[in-house]
């Protein structure tokens, strides 16, 4: 029987941030990945601000540059060290999606793979000698893009940092979108509720995917998320955009393309009718007191 490889404890958040930012500064975004993000509705400016970067074909030059800067990869999920040399636990083609905590620190990264059944996975080195396991974390986005969570703004909750970023940008950057890794991340959601309560948030909008209509497991998981929020005095309301579009990002992308119109579209002229939606109107959730 194969023995389990020793796994290191993760560095403190501020040290993870230092390493991840140093790594991302050495990487670039391939044209095909930039085009993928632009098709999702993001501008070049927004893509650059959120530090999306492509997986390098070779890590050797990255590690050589960072070694000169004294960067250590011990205790950093996604990396491991063997015989004094650093290695990345993944080399499949894709791009990195940084996860930012409430203090604007990068504390983890997901990879969006170009191919495969599972397109999104945590960048983790669990299972490697002196590797480090990635834990489920919530992403709050970066201040230059995502409004700060506090009691004065309506907070939305969805799954996936990329989806949250797109929804925030395409809806006008008016409200913060927090991203869980998935609807089953109950411990992660409880930690998030502790934070939300501490900054005066008492109500959040559930912007999880519309597949709840056909998936009982998703519905049951959402019920548990609602129950956890209630324990912290936080109520939740569903943002219901129907089932034509699976994710809130898909919905807002359709809005930006004119495939569906938001309600209360002003008339261009006094005697001109407001444009008719291709699909039914989906109401905004009003901000609660």
Q: What is the role of each PLM region?
A:
Residues 3-12, 16, 58-199:
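Phosphate-handling DNA/RNA-contact segment within nucleic-acid enzymes
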Residues 21-24, 39, 44, 49, ...:
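Generic secondary-structure boundary/loop-capping signal
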Residues 21-25, 51-55, 213:
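Conserved short loop/turn motifs at secondary-structure junctions
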Residues 119, 149-155, 161-289:
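TOPRIM fold recognition
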């Amino acid at each position: 029987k194969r023995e389990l490889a020793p796994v290191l404890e993760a560095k403190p958040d501020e040290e993870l941030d230092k390493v991840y930012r140093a790594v991302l500064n050495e990487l670039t975004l391939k044209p095909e990945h930039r085009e993928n993000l632009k098709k999702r509705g993001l501008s070049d400016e927004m893509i650059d601000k959120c530090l999306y970067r492509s997986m390098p074909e070779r890590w050797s030059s990255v590690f050589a540059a960072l070694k000169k800067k004294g960067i250590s990869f011990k205790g950093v999920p996604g990396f491991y060290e063997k015989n004094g040399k650093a290695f990345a636990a993944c080399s499949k083609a894709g791009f990195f999606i940084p996860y930012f905590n409430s203090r604007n620190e990068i504390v983890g990264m997901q990879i969006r793979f170009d191919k495969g059944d599972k397109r999104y996975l945590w960048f983790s080195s669990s299972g490697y000698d002196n590797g480090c396991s990635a834990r489920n974390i919530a992403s709050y986005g970066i201040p230059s893009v995502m409004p700060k969570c506090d009691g004065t703004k309506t907070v939305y909750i969805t799954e996936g940092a990329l989806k949250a970023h797109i929804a925030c940008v395409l809806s006008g950057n008016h409200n913060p979108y927090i991203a869980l890794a998935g609807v089953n991340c109950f411990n992660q959601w409880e930690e998030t509720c502790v934070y939300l309560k501490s900054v005066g948030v008492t109500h959040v909008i559930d912007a999880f995917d519309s597949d709840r209509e056909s998936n009982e497991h998703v519905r049951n998981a959402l019920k548990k998320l609602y129950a956890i929020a209630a324990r912290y005095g936080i109520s939740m309301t569903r943002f219901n955009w129907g089932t034509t579009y699976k994710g809130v990002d898909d919905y807002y992308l359709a809005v930006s393309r004119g495939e569906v119109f938001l309600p209360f579209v002003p008339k261009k002229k006094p005697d001109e009718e407001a444009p008719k939606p291709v699909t039914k109107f989906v109401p905004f959730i009003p901000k609660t007191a």
